[in-house]
UniProtKB/Swiss-Prot annotation:
Entry-linked PANTHER family: RIBOSOMAL PROTEIN S7
Protein name in UniProt: Small ribosomal subunit protein uS7
Any GO BP annotation: translation
Function: One of the primary rRNA binding proteins, it binds directly to 16S rRNA where it nucleates assembly of the head domain of the 30S subunit. Is located at the subunit interface close to the decoding center, probably blocks exit of the E-site tRNA.
Keyword Lyase: no
Pfam (any one): Ribosomal_S7
Species this chain originates from: Marinobacter nauticus (strain ATCC 700491 / DSM 11845 / VT8)
InterPro entries named among the record's database cross-references: Ribosomal_uS7 (IPR000235), Ribosomal_uS7_bac/org-type (IPR005717), Ribosomal_uS7_dom (IPR023798), Ribosomal_uS7_dom_sf (IPR036823)
SUPFAM superfamilies, A to Z: Ribosomal protein S7
HAMAP family: Ribosomal_uS7_B
Cellular component, GO annotation: small ribosomal subunit
Family assignment from sequence similarity: Belongs to the universal ribosomal protein uS7 family.
Domain of life: Bacteria
Length: 156
């Protein structure tokens, strides 16, 4: 814990095309080596593909995909008397968002399509439909928390 002031949260500037702060944050997650224009091209390209394949608003599909990936509970390791227990804890909203974005990018990169925009679009469409690797990751995390429910009395 810091002894001085806690650093103020910096406000994220919404993205220029859709005016969404959440999408701007996601673009930052996609970005590698500070190449923001490349990341923007990838994300906007993916959203164009999403709009093409599904006849819905791409930003709504993106939001729906993130909602389906966000974990409600996760496990944290806690040492008690020489034994390490996986203790289920609720995930705060900002971390839910961060994990969902991280998993969406991670599992998009592992897909087989040619371009990153196509991979990302595929993962967004799958996640919006409650399928795909990112949603499976969320289910695995929830299953882990459910299996370790007995240790939930070891609070943090």
């Amino acid at each position: 814990m810091p002894r001085r002031r806690v650093a103020a949260k910096r406000e994220i500037i919404p993205d220029p095309k859709f005016g969404s702060a959440r999408l701007a944050k996601f673009i930052n997650h996609v970005m590698e080596s500070g190449k923001k224009s490349v990341a923007e091209r990838i994300v906007y390209g993916a959203l164009d593909i999403v709009a093409e394949k599904s006849k819905e608003e791409p930003i709504e599909m993106f939001e729906k995909a993130l909602e389906n990936i966000q974990p409600m509970v996760e496990v944290k390791s806690r040492r008690v008397g020489g034994a390490t227990y996986q203790v289920p804890v609720e995930v705060r909203p900002s971390r839910q968002n961060a994990l969902a974005m991280r998993w969406l990018v991670e599992y998009s990169r592992k897909r087989g399509e040619k371009s990153m925009a196509q991979r990302l679009a595929g993962e967004i469409l799958d996640a919006a439909d409650s399928k795909g690797a990112a949603v499976k990751k969320r289910e695995d995390v929830h299953r882990m928390a459910e299996a370790n429910k007995a240790f939930s009395h070891f609070r943090f």
